[in-house]
Curated annotation (Swiss-Prot):
This is Sex-determining region Y protein. Its main location: nucleus. It comes from the Eukaryota. It comes from Arctocephalus gazella. It is found in: Nucleus speckle; Cytoplasm; Nucleus. CDD domains: HMG-box_SoxA_SRY. Residues 195-220 are annotated as: Disordered.
Amino acid sequence: MFGVLNSDDHRAAIQQRNILAFGRTSSELWTSNPTSNYWCETRGNGRDSGQNRVRRPMNAFMVWSRDQRRKVALENPQMQNSEISKQLGYQWKMLTEAEKWPFFEEAQRLQAVHREKYPDYKYRPRRKALPQKSDKLLPAASSSLLCRQVLVDKWYPFTYRDSCSRATHSHMEDQLSSSKPVNIANSLLQREHHYSSTSLRGSPETLATHLSADPPFYPK
């Protein structure tokens, strides 16, 4: 028993020593390779790629809202950034031209400094990611037929109670596929009214025949 425990302890000590040796070797390789450190620093922070991007010069509203936004955020710490922007936009519209003029002058000065510092600057707005469209699209003929079928099902819901109603529905589907969509409502309304009236309304002779065909019922 003691021999088994000693062998297990020895195996655990060997594994721990190998782990420490591997960590020391990997750290030495990491510090001795400057390109790997640069790759980690540049890829670790996603904003590094945007730091080289030249920012757009501020306009008059940006110059004015720079201090106002900080003031509103301190007064209302629970307010979201979108709500603060809406409030600042409303306050900017309420200012007069005389009140806006100093901020226009400051914006012109900042634009001149920006033009001297970056003479080749061109504003390139970031494009928004478009939603992916499905590759499978219905053809024009099938989509139009589908719209017609939905329209018919909405106007005239069928209940397949007998073979006559099934034949009527299939006959109307065949006519929908070859007819024009202008006179669909009138033709369907007339045909449905005709078939419903003929199926529900019968002659006295037909009713008498059905009644006489049924066997009499005698209670026991």
